[in-house]
C-alpha cells in the first residue's frame, strides 16, 4: 500500500507539473487582459547571507536574518503528501458523518446543495487568491499568514493570523469532540452497540477528549515526517469510508428498523422528492426553529479546511508550486465527494431517520466499520493537523515579533524546527475549547474562517488594483473580479449567518490591528496600502492640474528653507502649526561643485532629515538638493517643489545668520548683530550640513522670491519663542500690519504717478495670524491682538472704529490696540521728529544708528540753520511730484528699501519711491498689481480697506501738484516725512514697549529695491535696517504677499 501511494504521488506531481507549464487562457478575460506571468523567483543561494546580507537596508536586516537563520536540513514534502493529502483530509471533516444527515433532514436536499455551492464558491475564490499570492515569491513557514502579512502589512496580516490561529484551535476542539462521540456510542456502558465498558457522563467524556488531545500533541512533537507517514494511511481510510456511503446506497437492501427510527429505501426518486424541500424543526434549546442560517453555520466548517496545505508551507519543498496545485485539486476532489454523499443520502433515507438518528451513516453502510474507521481517522487527522498547523502558525507570528512577549513561542527544535513551546500553548487553549459542544464550536469556526478567507481575497484584490509592477504571480487563473467577488461573498455570508458574531469578529480584528500597530517594530515587508495610496494620489494630483484654485479654499502651503533643523526646531514647529492641514516642505541646499561626489552626503542627509521629522512628529516632506551655491539651490527648490496643483504658495526664509562678522554695527550701541540670528552656534549639530551665508546672497535669495509667484515670509528670533501654555498667563499673537504704499510711477510723468497699495500683504497678516490661533495649543494659550498706529490723539477713536469694522468684515475676533506716536513718551520720536532733548546715552545711540543716513545728515544741517534748535522745526512736506532725494542728495546713494508710509489720518502723506539712476531705473521687484489678482472684483479691496486708506486712493490725494516758492520752514515735520531707518527706530521703540507678553509678532516685510544684492554695502544696510526694526522684539514673522487670501463672498 505504501509503494502504491508513493507511485501515485509521483504520477500526481508529474501530471501537475505538465499542466502548470501549459499555456492556457483564462475563459473569463479577453486576450489583452490576461495576467502577466513570470518565472518563479529562485531560492537564495547558500552564499547570499554572507555576501549580500550586509548590503541590505538597515531596516530589513533583522527580519531577513530571523527568516534565514532557521535550519533547512529537515526532510521536505512534495505536493501530493504535503498539500493535497492534508487539504483533502482536513476538508473531509468529521461533520460529514455526524451532522450531514441532520442538515439534509432540516434544510432538504436543495438547500443543502445550495450550502455546498456557496461554501465551495467561497473556497474556490479563496484558493485562487491564496494561490496567486503564494506564487508571487518565496513562501516560508506560516502559510497563509506569511503570504498575507507580507502582502498587506504586519498590522492586518498579524490580526488575520491570530484570528486564523484561534479558528484552527476551535476546529481542533470540534474534531476531538467528534472523535470521542462514536467511541461512546460503540463502547459506552449505556449506549454502546458493540461493547459496554466505558463510563459515560459529561466529565468522563471530557477526560476522553483530554486524552485524545494529549496523544495528538505527542504525535505533533515527533515532527512532520511522522505526520506524512500517518496521513498517507489515514487518507486511504477516509477516502474509502467516504466512497462507501454512495456505494452502500446502491448495494444495501432497503430496510426499516423502528428501534433505530431508520427507514432505508435505497436509491429512490420518491425518497429524493420527499427530502427535496426543507422541514425545519424546533431547535435544541427550545427557543425557536432551526433555519437556513443555523444549519449553514454548522455546515460551513466541513468545507473550510482549504488552508491546511498552505499551513504546511514551511515543510514543503516548493511552496509556491505545491500550494496552488494541491489546494485547487483537493477542492475539486472533495466537492465531488460531498455532492455524491448529499444526493445519495437524500435519495435513500427518509426524513425521520435523517433527523432522529445521529448514527444513520453507520446503520446504512455496507459495514459499520467503514463509517467508524472514517470518523476515527478524520477526527484523529484533523485534530493532529489542527494542533500542528496552529503551532506552526503561532511560531511564525512569534518570529515576526509582532506583539511583545511572544518571542518565547518562536523556538523550534535544532533538527526539523518543531515548535514544542507553541504546541504546548496550543494544547492548553484547545483544552479550554473542549467545554463547548460541537454545534457552538462550528458556528464560531464559521466566523473565524470566513473572516480569514475574506481578508485573503481582499489582500489579493488590493494587490491587483494597485498595479504594482512586482506583483506578477505565476498562477494565472485569477483577476480583480474573482478576488472582489470572493471578498464580498466571504463577508456577506459571514454577516448573513450571524450578524452579532460577525460584528464581534471584526471588532476583535480591529483591536488586534491597533495593538500590533503600536507594539510592532518597523518591518520592511511592504504594504499594499502604499500602492493603493500612490495610485489614488496620482489620480487626484492630475485632477488638481485642471482645477483653478479659488480664493475661498486658499490655505497656506509652506516651503520652509532652513540651514540646520536642530537649531531651527522652533521655527519648524511654528510652521507646522501654521500649515492648516496643507502642504509643508522642509527645504535645504547642500552646497557643492561636484554633484557626483556629494551623492553620498545627500543620502546621509536625507536619512537624518527624515529621522528628524519622524522623531519630532512634524507633518512635513523633506526636499534636499545639491547646487553650486545657495542662490541656485533655492531657486531650484522654489521652482520645483510640490507636485501637480499642490505647490508651495508661501516660501519661508529664516533671517540671515549675522555671525559672519564679529563686530557691532556701531560702537557703544545696544543694537548688536552678533546674537540676532535665531540659530546659535552653540546649538549646532555637526551631523547636519550647514553654511554661513553673506548678506548679498541672502538679499539675492529674497529678491528672487519677491519676483516669483510665491508669497514670502522672513522669520527672526524664534530661538526665543515661548510656546503657549494651556494654563497660566495668556500670551498674544500680535498683528502689526503696516500698510505700505510703494511708488512705481514713471519718470516721464511724475505729476501723476501710479501707486500700488499692498493690500494683499495687509490681509495676509490677518489671515496667517488667525490660522496660527486655530492650532490647539495656540488657541488655548494665546489671544489675537491687532496693533495699529496713529500720530495724533484726535485720530485714535476713528482708527479704533475702523479697525473693529475691518476685523468684523474679516470674521476675526481680536483685541485692538491703537498707539499714538505723539501721546507716548518715545525718545526716538521726540529726538527725531520734535527735535527735543533726550538722555545723552539715548541721543548718542540714535546718532550712531543714523550716522550713515543721508536724510538725517541733511536734516541736521537744516536744524542747525534754525533760530531755536530746541523747538519744533519747520520742514517742507514731501510732495509726490517732487523728487526730494534727487534734489537734495547724491543720486549714487539711493535708499536700500522703500520707506514705510503709514496711513495716519489727514496728516499723512504718501512717499513716492526714491528714484535712482541705477541700471534698473524705477523697476519694481513684484509683478504689477493687476496681474496678481485672482479675480476681477475691484470692490472687495475698497470695502475691506480702512477708511483712511480709501481716502488716499485718488491720485489727487496722493500726488498733489508742486507749489513753487513755498515756505518750507513753516511746515511741521511728521512721521511720514522721515527716512526709512528713522521710521524703523521709532517703530522698534513703540512696539517693544507693548509686546512684553507677545508670543509671535506678524508684520510686513519691507521689500528691497531691485538689484540691491549687487552691492555688498547696500545689502548690508538693508539687513541692518531690518535688524534695527526687530531688535529686542519677540519672534517676528515678516510677510510680503502678492495675492489676496481673504474674501467676503459666500
From Swiss-Prot:
Q: Which InterPro entries match?
A: AA-permease/SLC12A_dom (IPR004841), SLC12A_fam (IPR004842)
Q: Which residues carry this modification: Phosphoserine?
A: 9, 60, 270, 901, 936
Tell me which parts of the chain lie in the Cytoplasmic compartment. Answer: 1-83, 134-146, 224-232, 317-334, 390-417, 464-480, 521-1050
Q: Which GO terms describe its biological process?
A: cell volume homeostasis; chloride ion homeostasis; chloride transmembrane transport; potassium ion homeostasis; vacuolar transmembrane transport
Q: Where is this region: Disordered?
A: 915-943
Bilayer-crossing regions: 84-104, 113-133, 147-169, 203-223, 233-253, 296-316, 335-355, 369-389, 418-438, 443-463, 481-497, 500-520
Q: Which residues are glycosylated?
A: 175
Source species, domain of life: Eukaryota
Bias (Polar residues) ranges:
916-928
Protein name per UniProt: Uncharacterized transporter C18H10.16
- Pfam families, A to Z: AA_permease
- Compartment(s) of residence: Membrane
Membrane topology is: Multi-pass membrane protein
- Family designation: Belongs to the SLC12A transporter family.
Recorded GO cellular component terms are: vacuolar membrane
State a single Gene Ontology molecular function: potassium:chloride symporter activity
Q: Which residues lie on this side of the membrane: Extracellular?
A: 105-112, 170-202, 254-295, 356-368, 439-442, 498-499
Does the record bear Heme in its keywords?
no
Residue numbers bearing the Phosphothreonine modification: 64, 271, 939
Which of UniProt's keywords are assigned here? Answer: Glycoprotein, Membrane, Phosphoprotein, Transmembrane, Transmembrane helix, Transport
